[in-house]
Amino acid sequence: MKNGVKQLFLLSLIGLSLTNVAWAEVARPKNDTLTNTIQSAELKTSSFSSMPKKEIPNRHIISLSKSQLAHHPRLVLRGLIPALYQNNTQAVQLLLPLYKQFPQQDNFLLTWAKAIEAREQGDLTQSIAYYRELFARDASLLPLRYQLAQALFFNYENEAAKIQFEKLRTEVDDEKFLGVIDQYLLTLNQRNQWIWQVGLNFLNDDNLNNAPKSGTKIGSWTAWEKESGQGVGYSLSVEKKWPWADHFFSKTMFNGNGKYYWDNKKYNEATVRIGGGLGYQTASVEVSLFPFQEKRWYAGGSSGTNTMKQYADKLGIRLENVDWLSKTWQISTALEYGESRYKIRKHLDGNYYFVSSTLFYLPKSTQFWFVGMDFHRENTQALDNAYQQKTLRLGWGQDWFYGISSRLTFSYANRVYREKDLIGIQQKNREYTTTITLWHRNIHFMGLTPKLSWDYQKSTSNHAFYRYDKNRIYLEIGKIF
């Protein structure tokens, strides 16, 4: 298909005038519910390419009827390729039946045409499936990404559509087209729908309690032994926005996550956070402030039981800001303050401060980089449990050929405790984490995409009991809808 793609604009320079075809029209679904703020725009091929436009003399233009075209496969192909790129529904519907009759067909072009046809017929689910199949084969085609984003938008898959439009925005230079994308993003932000995100990963941890090397001793003190466990990790996030006038909104959110080990239930845990507040948003900026309440249940660890019990409560407030500095740079910042109260371990009662900032760079729609810094201060009644931690995070994501995608993240944290513990050591830890995740963009099960991850953690410390390293491989699946 790549050779055919490279020939696209060369072929499209050969004039072809078809009966009842309007080349510049942007196709929209029959049941189009797009708000009036988004107008039908002429998105010419030059919107997606730096190829120079050429004026085509009238003497090079020929006019053929549909029956005459059926005898000219090369002309049909020359018309179909730019029709696909220009999102021209009428031309695709005219040429696709003719193209299907020819003995030699390009499967990529055929699937693309079917995606446009399915969208026009109102079968958005099938259209999206076709687009995802194409994306798995080549994620670099910007017209393809735009059409996928459109289909997701009209199918009310809001978060997925937003991701595609934001990626597309990084590679578009045409101001008119950027304005269209911003209108889509603004409309997505104003939709007052529930947003759901679910996740599941299979756990296989051979060092649940982060134990040091077996037999580690400090004087007469002996470190705890490793415990292992297999199970599942789960998460659920739900959010709803209610738009107000002048870009303001109110928001309700719920976040829940936990771990269930079927062969070591003493380490089962679950956390739930509920919050709501106010915010302000445009196509490129979103700021929100909301109080929250959090509850945690825990079975107790090595000294616990097989039943989870209420472990701790938190009450706090969080400020979040996301700002597109340019079409390729984004900064995300969060500030959080909370009060912690424990049911049994009262010496851990106190408050905490958390500040996080992440800078994203998206040089193109198939790649992103980020660098982030976090500061966390935990104040507890027992000062040997109080600490402050500084973290540096780095990451790189890439969509490769043949449908493969990858994500690599690295973090380094420096944690220093305020006072000496019972053994007489003021703990100072350096914590390293590396995670590599791989998945195939065209592999889905009931709408869920499986991802394979390898995770390595290492802790070095002046306290021998807190030196350990471990690695694990696990499968995770998730979906946003």
UniProtKB/Swiss-Prot annotation:
Function of the molecule? Required for correct export to the cell surface of some cell outer membrane lipoproteins.
UniProt lineage: Bacteria, Pseudomonadati, Pseudomonadota, Gammaproteobacteria, Pasteurellales
Q: Where is this region: N-terminal domain?
A: 24-192
Residue ranges spanning the membrane: these are: 194-204, 223-243, 248-257, 271-281, 285-295, 315-325, 329-339, 353-363, 368-377, 390-399, 404-414, 432-441, 448-458, 471-481
> What Gene Ontology terms describe where this protein resides (cellular component)?
cell outer membrane
Domain text: Consists of a soluble N-terminal domain and C-terminal probable beta-barrel in the outer membrane with 14 predicted beta-strands.
The way it spans or sits in the membrane comes to: Multi-pass membrane protein
Q: Does the keyword ATP-binding apply?
A: no
Give the signal peptide as a residue range, or say none if absent.
1-24
Keywords, ordered alphabetically: Cell outer membrane, Membrane, Signal, Transmembrane, Transmembrane beta strand
Origin superkingdom = Bacteria
Annotated source species: Haemophilus influenzae (strain ATCC 51907 / DSM 11121 / KW20 / Rd)
Protein name according to UniProt: Surface lipoprotein assembly modifier 2
Compartments reported by the entry: Cell outer membrane
Q: Which family does it belong to?
A: Belongs to the Slam family.
**Region: C-terminal probable beta barrel, residue numbers:** 193-481
